[in-house]
């Protein structure tokens, strides 16, 4: 980070006013999500916790090109924390017809579409090798023994024996995954690849049984739009701001705290209040998807919300959405999170002057919203991403070193700076 943007490692009073605001007493401990029957009995210090997750949305405009017929998908994901057992949550939540899974498998990824030798494990569903997911539903696999290391790549393979379209997927994965030639290759160490894809079809979450030590494992859920989704970050490198945060949590840790997973529920084009985008790929608004994408996350401990820019820029330029409507939406997120025992962390909206849709009226809404986020006292904590990314000489613009070129999305360095500004003592035991 530049000298003008010092890191904040703790919410000390002199610096907290610029980067971080703490409000209210600590909340009661969040209840653990009940695990499915384990391969071995979990010890009292173990807890199921999400290590990776994404936000499923609807099909892209080119859905007809994203189809599979008797093929195996090998989907690559990056674990934030480790554990001794693993289970996978698949999703047909945007589908209108049942989805049949013929076989599923998980292993440690070595490189490309290949697995580390001996790491492959078959996934079962109620003891059966396959399952059918009803339209609109998720599907959780049985747990399986697999030693997963933090910050390692996993390969989830799923054989789809029927001809299906990717009606439920996360479109902007920033990660290459693989589609096989015809047949069931779920357990094959080296997948015979027909083509690559850069999305995650029918996949929502990976959980691990984490050894928690002095405190149970918990997960941070990053809820947001394309800035959380990592737009314009380097592909196949895990350089979204939640990825950088996961690295910090592993490298720097936090005394007295159990493992902290990080799950990215950002969707490019997403809004807080309304499905403004015509494309289903932008997902349902945050208020609508909150229960599925936040509260249903295994081991949810913290909501980290950076959302609202698209509500502002998609509204009519002559009369932008009132700041009060966004504030009312934030209050709903906060109330619903706290009701379930989560701590609610809010982030200020980042600069976007230079974008074609920038107007002074829209900027005024952003400033009003940010003033409330900083000073309203409703969040348990606030991280000032606006302060971190803005150009001190032109505060309505991104700092050039953090501007990816579209004047909205950060560079890799910008995403890293965002994560560096998050005080890790936010994630103490709850």
Give the ranges of each region predicted by the language model.
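N-terminal secretory signal peptides
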Residues: 1-16, 26-34
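Conserved SGNH/GDSL esterase-like catalytic core that processes O-acyl groups on lipids
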Residues: 52, 69-70, 75, 98, ...
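N-terminal secretory targeting modules
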Residues: 17-27, 33, 39-223, 229-237, ...
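Surface-exposed amphipathic alpha-helices with a cationic face
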Residues: 331-338
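Active-site-proximal beta-strand/loop segments in catalytic clefts of secreted hydrolases
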Residues: 91, 159, 223-226, 265-268, ...
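Catalytic His-Asp segment of secreted/periplasmic serine-dependent ester chemistry enzymes
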Residues: 271, 278-279, 283, 313, ...
């Amino acid at each position: 980070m530049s000298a003008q943007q010092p890191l904040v490692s703790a919410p000390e009073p002199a610096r907290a006013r610029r980067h971080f605001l703490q409000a209210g007493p600590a909340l009661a401990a969040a209840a653990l999500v009940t695990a499915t029957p384990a391969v071995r009995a979990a010890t009292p210090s173990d807890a199921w916790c999400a290590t990776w997750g994404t936000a499923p949305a609807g099909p892209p405009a080119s859905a007809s090109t994203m189809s599979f017929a008797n093929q195996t998908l090998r989907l690559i994901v990056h674990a934030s924390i480790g554990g001794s057992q693993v289970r996978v949550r698949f999703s047909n939540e945007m589908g209108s017809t049942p989805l049949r899974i013929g076989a599923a498998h998980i292993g440690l990824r070595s490189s490309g579409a290949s697995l580390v030798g001996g790491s492959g494990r078959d996934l079962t569903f109620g003891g059966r090798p396959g399952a059918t997911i009803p339209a609109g539903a998720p599907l959780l696999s049985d747990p399986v023994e697999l030693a997963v290391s933090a910050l390692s790549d996993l390969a989830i393979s799923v054989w789809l024996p029927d001809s299906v379209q990717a009606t439920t997927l996360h479109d902007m994965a920033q990660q290459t995954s693989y589609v096989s030639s015809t047949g069931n290759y779920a357990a094959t160490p080296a997948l015979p690849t027909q083509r690559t894809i850069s999305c995650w079809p029918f996949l929502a979450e990976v959980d691990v049984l984490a050894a928690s030590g002095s405190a149970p494992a918990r997960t941070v859920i990053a809820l947001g739009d394309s800035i959380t989704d990592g737009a314009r970050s380097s592909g196949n490198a895990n350089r979204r701001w939640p990825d950088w945060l996961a690295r910090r949590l592993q490298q720097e840790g936090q005394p007295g705290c159990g493992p902290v997973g990080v799950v990215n529920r950002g969707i490019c084009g997403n809004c807080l209040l309304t499905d403004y985008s015509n494309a289903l790929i932008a997902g349902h608004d945050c208020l609508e998807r909150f229960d599925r994408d936040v509260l249903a996350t295994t081991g949810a401990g913290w909501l980290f919300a950076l959302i609202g820019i698209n509500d502002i820029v998609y509204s009519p330029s002559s009369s932008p959405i009132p700041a009060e409507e966004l504030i009312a939406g934030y209050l709903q997120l906060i109330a619903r999170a706290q009701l379930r025992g989560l701590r609610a962390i809010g982030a200020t909206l980042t600069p976007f002057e230079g974008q074609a849709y920038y107007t002074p009226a829209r900027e005024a809404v952003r400033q009003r919203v940010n003033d409330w986020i900083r000073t309203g006292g409703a969040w348990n904590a606030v991280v000032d991403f606006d302060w971190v990314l803005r150009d001190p000489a032109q505060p309505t613009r991104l700092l050039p070193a953090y501007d990816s070129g579209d004047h909205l999305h950060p560079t890799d360095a910008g995403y890293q700076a965002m994560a560096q500004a998050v005080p890790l003592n936010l994630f103490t035991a709850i």
